[in-house]
Amino acid sequence: MRHRKIGRKLNCKSDHRNAIFKNMACSLILNEIIKTTLAKAKELRRIVEPMITLSKIDTVAHRRLLFSRIRNNEVIAKLFKKIGPIFYNRSGGYTRILKCGFRFGDKAPMAYIELVDRVRKSKEKKKLSSNNNLIKNK
């Protein structure tokens, strides 16, 4: 029985699961939004939020601890230089999960997971502003 077991197995071995979430955490931090299944998004939130909490205070110990988990210097640099200062005053809830329908092949529920205070790219801003102009003109 799986009473009081924390986490999802996701039908894979523990080494594979750890590798999946390490890569997904790197992708989320670098891109600030990714699309994945709902179960993986919920598990990824449990991994990424403590990382962001550690990155709010820039110490050598925190850098080494995060490097032992991620093993990617580019991601560590972005965490401490950009993401940590953005979330400094926020006490939790750094990610948002948005459901986005079902996958075509197997109807698995899909979701976007994104950082809450992410910086939107100029292409997205243009799209949003053009939609607002169309609504105002009607």
UniProtKB/Swiss-Prot annotation:
Keywords: Ribonucleoprotein, Ribosomal protein. The keyword Ribonucleoprotein applies. One of its GO terms (biological process) is translation. It comes from the Bacteria. GO terms for cellular component: cytosolic large ribosomal subunit. Belongs to the bacterial ribosomal protein bL17 family. This is Large ribosomal subunit protein bL17. It comes from Buchnera aphidicola subsp. Schizaphis graminum (strain Sg).
